[in-house]
Curated annotation (Swiss-Prot):
This is Tol-Pal system protein TolB. It holds the Pfam family TolB_N. Part of the Tol-Pal system, which plays a role in outer membrane invagination during cell division and is important for maintaining outer membrane integrity. Its main location: periplasm. The keyword Signal applies. GO terms for biological process: cell division; protein import. Belongs to the TolB family. Residues 1-23 form the signal peptide. Keywords: Cell cycle, Cell division, Periplasm, Signal. PANTHER family: PROTEIN TOLB, PROTEIN TOLB HOMOLOG. It comes from Zymomonas mobilis subsp. mobilis (strain ATCC 31821 / ZM4 / CP4). NCBIfam families: propeller_TolB. It comes from the Bacteria. InterPro entries: 6-blade_b-propeller_TolB-like (IPR011042), PD40 (IPR011659), Tol-Pal_TolB (IPR014167), TolB_N (IPR007195).
Length: 458
């Protein structure tokens, strides 16, 4: 863990051992897995689709004593942490949290000794309890426990030490631990989204680079809107963002460092450059550049230097995206007469078309799991869909009037995109899971477009 948030051995409660307990891997399939003692452990199987979300209780987290911190009292933070955890789990579409106000007030000793009979009568199948404690050095400790109500047993416990200002990160980490333990899937709640904030009339939009947590919290603007910005993309290190900006009315690719606010020009050429994206190792940026009326895909070291041309077709080649291992690139091209999806080796060799459905395809993005490619489907509207890397198994996930610009969550189970309203023209950020059932609006202060979902934070 980083210095911002670190795991903590839960020694604050006498019933807990001095080392953190890590959950066992769930069984490969089924609603539950048999353990050595023949008790059945809860499991949410998300591969076959969810007919009924799991009832789960996340009561207010108690504190040994209410202490004032820079982020409020620990008593207030206990309520807020529980609320964030509950909202995270609900947003996945896999869980139905009980209404917090209707739940039993958990005392501090009860954190490690749940009243199973009460929680069983409440209808909850799983229980998330914890605590918030102020430390002498000004930090907070947030404890996180998951219990199987039916089996009356603990499934995991973890703890996180954070600065008071970072209490939401501890909540997201707890939700991630619960999600992973119950589904077997990787976490994604403790992550951020960078996007384009928009305001103003259609013919004179003010566009600013902005960043926020994946749930819309901790929002801040990164640019002032003096120059138009487009297509931000996170680096694998979570510390930098590449994007297109019209400084001096000339589109150029830049890299923005989140910690310092430093901005650096990547490709210093008079040609139009756009659609940048980092390689998985963060050492290369792949992008499109127009030369003599022809648009092809190039790559350049992040530090700058000579750009290498990867495609040479007479059409428009753009929107490149690396495979997770960096060996291949998916991109869109109209070389066949309409926008379609192609895959090539990272050096530009072996270019092959993979999309053959009706309509046109744009903005392909490789899943971090490596198994799917998300895209925008154009035909009777704009829709977000996925296909396998050989082009088979195409599935349309959204049915809005204009849904586009997909970006994968860190675990490859959820896709962020932006939606344009038919009548008003307003743009909003949304997410959808791979079933296409669980759509979620991502709140932003103003209109939003071009989301880029960053990697999981350390």
């Amino acid at each position: 863990m980083s210095s911002v948030i670190r795991k903590w051995a839960l020694t604050a409660l006498m019933a807990v051992s001095s080392t953190a307990l890590f959950a066992q891997n769930p069984a490969a399939s089924g609603q539950a897995a048999n353990q050595g003692d023949n008790r059945r452990i809860l499991r949410v199987d998300i591969t076959g689709g969810i007919s009924q979300p799991m009832p789960i209780a996340v009561p207010v987290m108690p504190t040994p004593s209410s202490v004032e911190t820079l982020a409020g009292t620990t008593a207030v933070l206990g309520r807020q942490v529980a609320s964030v955890i509950s909202n995270d789990l609900k947003s996945s579409g896999l869980f139905t949290p009980s209404q917090q106000a209707s739940l039993h007030n958990v005392s501090f000793p009860e954190v490690t000794a749940p009243q199973y009979s009460y929680w069983l009568s409440s209808g909850a199948q799983a229980l998330v309890q914890g605590f918030v404690q102020a430390n002498g050095d000004g930090t907070l400790t947030v404890g996180c426990y998951l219990y199987d109500v039916f089996a009356s047993q603990e499934m995991l416990h973890k703890g996180f030490v954070v600065k008071p200002a970072d209490w939401r990160r501890a909540a997201h980490k707890c939700a991630d631990a619960v999600y992973t333990r119950l589904t077997g899937e990787g976490p994604y709640f403790d992550s951020r989204i960078v996007y384009i904030s928009e305001t103003g009339p259609k013919n004179h939009r003010l566009k600013r680079l902005a960043i926020m947590d994946q749930d819309g919290a901790n929002h801040r603007f990164l640019t002032n809107g003096q120059s138009m910005v487009l297509t931000p993309r996170f680096a694998p290190n979570q510390q930098t963002v590449t994007y297109l900006s019209y400084v001096g009315n000339s589109p150029r690719i830049y890299v923005y460092t989140l910690g310092s606010g430093h901005v650096r020009l990547v490709v210093n050429k008079p040609n139009t450059t756009f659609a940048p994206r980092f390689s998985p190792d963060g050492k290369t940026i792949v992008f499109s550049m127009s030369v003599a009326g022809n648009t092809d895909i190039y790559k350049v070291p992040v530090s700058g230097g000579q750009a290498t041309r990867l495609t040479t077709s007479p059409g428009i080649d753009t929107a490149p995206s690396f495979s997770p291992d960096g060996s291949k690139i998916v991109f869109e091209s109209d070389r066949s007469g309409s926008q379609q999806i192609y895959i090539m080796n990272a050096d530009g060799s072996n270019q092959n078309r993979i999309s053959f459905g009706s309509g046109r395809y744009a903005t392909p993005v490789w899943s971090p799991r490596g198994d799917l490619i998300a895209f925008t489907k154009l035909g009777g509207g704009f829709h977000v869909g996925v296909m396998k890397t050989d082009g088979s198994g195409e599935q349309i996930l959204t049915n809005g009037w204009q849904d586009e610009g997909p970006s994968w969550s860190p675990n490859g189970r959820v896709i962020a995109f932006f939606r344009t309203a038919r009548n008003s023209g307003h743009t909003e950020l949304w997410s959808v899971d791979l079933t296409g059932v669980n759509e979620r609006h991502i709140p932003t202060p103003l209109d939003g477009s071009d989301p880029s979902w960053g990697p999981l934070l350390p």
